[in-house]
A protein has these predicted regions:
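PP2C/PPM-type serine/threonine phosphatase catalytic domain
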Residues: 1-208
Length: 208
C-alpha cells in the first residue's frame, strides 16, 4: 500500500481522466502550500496505480484542523485507514461509508475529541466516480471549461441558516455568529454525517 504524505494546508488534488474505447489514462497530482501556518497538517495518498485496471484508483485528501491538537496525526491516520482497506468491495459503496464511520469512532476514542481533520476520498472505477467527504475540503470537476462543486461544505453556518429559515432567529444572526465558519462535521467526532455519491458520476474524456 502506498503511504500518505505529510506535507502542507490548502493542498489540491488534481485528477485528469482521458478515456477512449481502447485506452484509459489517469494523471494525479498533489499540490500543496503551507500558507501562514507553522506546521503542515495535510495528508494525501493514492492506491497503487498498477491495480487501476482491476480495482480502480483511490485518492484521499485530509486536512488536519489547525485550531485543534493532533490535526496532522489524525489526517495521516485517516488516509492510512482508507488506503489499507482498499480495494473496496464492488459495487457496495455503503461498506466504504461504514469504514469511515468506524475510523472516526476509533480516532475519537484515541484522541478524546481533541483533534480532527476533513476528508475527501475519490474512487474512480472505470469511467465512474464515487466520492465521500466530511468537513469543508472541496471536490471539484472541471468539464469543458466549466468548474462544478461536487460536494457540500459542512459548516456550522449552514445549520444556522436552516434554523433561521425555520423562524428560530433573524437570518442576519446566521452570518454574524462567531461560530459560523466552524466545521459542523469532521473526522474525529464520535459520529459524523457524510456527503457522498448515491449514484456514481459518469466521467468523460478530458474531465479533470
Amino acid at each position: 500500500q502506498q503511504q500518505p504524505s505529510e506535507p502542507a494546508p490548502e493542498s489540491l488534488c488534481v485528477t485528469t481522466v482521458l478515456t477512449s474505447e481502447k485506452t484509459s489514462i489517469l494523471d494525479i497530482a498533489n499540490l500543496q502550500g503551507i500558507g501562514q501556518r507553522e506546521q503542515q497538517q495535510d495528508a494525501f495518498g493514492i492506491s497503487p496505480a498498477d491495480r487501476y485496471e482491476t480495482d480502480g484508483i483511490l485518492a484521499v485528501l485530509c486536512d488536519g484542523m489547525g485550531g485543534m491538537a493532533e490535526g496532522q496525526r489524525i489526517a495521516v491516520q485517516t488516509v492510512s485507514c482508507l488506503l489499507n482497506h482498499f480495494p473496496f468491495p464492488k459495487p457496495q459503496t455503503k461498506a466504504v461509508s461504514e469504514l469511515i464511520f468506524t475510523c472516526t469512532r476509533k480516532i475519537y476514542q484515541q484522541f478524546y475529541g481533541h483533534g480532527g481533520c476533513t476528508l475527501v476520498a475519490a474512487w474512480i472505477l472505470g469511467n465512474q466516480l464515487h466520492f465521500w467527504s466530511v468537513g469543508d475540503s472541496d471536490l471539484f470537476l472541471l468539464r469543458e471549461h466549466q468548474l462544478y462543486a461536487l460536494n457540500t461544505r459542512q459548516e456550522f453556518q449552514k445549520d444556522l441558516l436552516l434554523r433561521s429559515f425555520q423562524g428560530a432567529f433573524p437570518i442576519e444572526e446566521a452570518f454574524s455568529d462567531p461560530q459560523a465558519g466552524a466545521l459542523s462535521q469532521y473526522i474525529g467526532k464520535e459520529e459524523v454525517t457524510l456527503d457522498r455519491t448515491h449514484i456514481p458520476l459518469s466521467l468523460f474524456p478530458g474531465d479533470t
